[in-house]
Amino acid sequence: MRAYLRPLSFLYDQVVGVKNNLYDRGVFGVFKAPVPVVSIGNLTVGGTGKTPITDFCLKSLVADGKKVAVISRSYRADASAPCLVDVDHPFAARYFGDEPVLLAQANPQVSVYVGPSKWRTARYAVEKHKYDLLIVDDGFQHRRLHRDLNIVILDATESLSNYEVLPEGRARESWAGIERADVLILSKCNLAPEDELKALEARLPKNKEVLYFGYEIQQCQNVKTGQVLHRDELKGKKLFLVSAIARPDVFEKMMREIGEVSNQSLHFRDHHQYTADDVKNIENAFKKSQADYLVTTGKDAVKLRQLFNDTAILWSTSLEVAESGRKGRLHEIITQVLR
């Protein structure tokens, strides 16, 4: 099947290549913000673990006393103009987007802005307030906005064949685009088979600094009551999973390290907007599975919280990332653009 898609991938790659070439030659205009801009992005269409890395960076910058704003796109959301995310909005996830709301909830000292165009949203943010730094969420391909640092995340669990250009693979542009990156991050390294990790490393440009991050679920929190269960308390328990993320297989793999995952678990398409009917189907499937716990991701919890408002059966995972090797190196790299 993939071979039949190759001609379409070739055409797509040519179009993207022309666009990038025009940006490289300065034909297209670029907005340069009055403060440093750091992009955290990827080559593929999603599921690299970008949001946890962004959250990791925000927490380290806030701890260092920096005033930071996040620039994101209102993907599959209702916001039609640049605006500041309001976590108290009655339908926050639907209006602003699940990932922006998740980042805003986890980092109350950070301003998170969304809009249909990242460069316009960045302009809106710096016109409203003074910041030390802008973090552009998923900004690698958005070249209309100048950035001072390009961080690209590569999923260590991703098959190398998926780095073929869309629609044959999952890449938004060819592997050659990685040369625009200043720093590469290999995510989920602890979840990747050693041979696959080595194959990915062998393909990386030799002139790029590479950082390694591991991902682990340490606990679950009840969405309604706030009760926390450590991973050790879930050992031997049957877990029914529900998610709408790009890589549900990775979510399942992490949960299998904790408990027994039900084979009746439900996974929707990435960024799916849940409905009341979805919740009824989830509840019915959960009951039929006879699982002990109904577990979802943090990103999904921001959308499901209100829909499960009358019951305390839903639990949200807490994903932690750990920097391997030289601790604090990513923070050091980012703060260098402030000097």
UniProtKB/Swiss-Prot annotation:
Domain of life: Bacteria
Enzyme class at the top of the EC tree: transferase
GO BP field: lipid A biosynthetic process; lipopolysaccharide core region biosynthetic process
Involved pathway(s): Glycolipid biosynthesis; lipid IV(A) biosynthesis; lipid IV(A) from (3R)-3-hydroxytetradecanoyl-[acyl-carrier-protein] and UDP-N-acetyl-alpha-D-glucosamine: step 6/6
Reaction it catalyzes: a lipid A disaccharide + ATP = a lipid IVA + ADP + H(+)
Disulfide bonds: none
The EC number(s) this enzyme carries: 2.7.1.130
A Gene Ontology term for the protein's cellular component: plasma membrane
Signal peptide residues on this chain, from the entry's feature table: none
A molecular-function term among this protein's GO annotations: tetraacyldisaccharide 4'-kinase activity
Keyword NADP included in the entry's annotation: no
Binding site for ATP: 44-51
Keywords: ATP-binding, Kinase, Lipid A biosynthesis, Lipid biosynthesis, Lipid metabolism, Nucleotide-binding, Transferase
Similarity remark: Belongs to the LpxK family.
PANTHER family, A to Z: TETRAACYLDISACCHARIDE 4'-KINASE, TETRAACYLDISACCHARIDE 4'-KINASE, MITOCHONDRIAL-RELATED
Function: Transfers the gamma-phosphate of ATP to the 4'-position of a tetraacyldisaccharide 1-phosphate intermediate (termed DS-1-P) to form tetraacyldisaccharide 1,4'-bis-phosphate (lipid IVA).
Name this protein carries in UniProt: Tetraacyldisaccharide 4'-kinase
Provenance organism: Bdellovibrio bacteriovorus (strain ATCC 15356 / DSM 50701 / NCIMB 9529 / HD100)
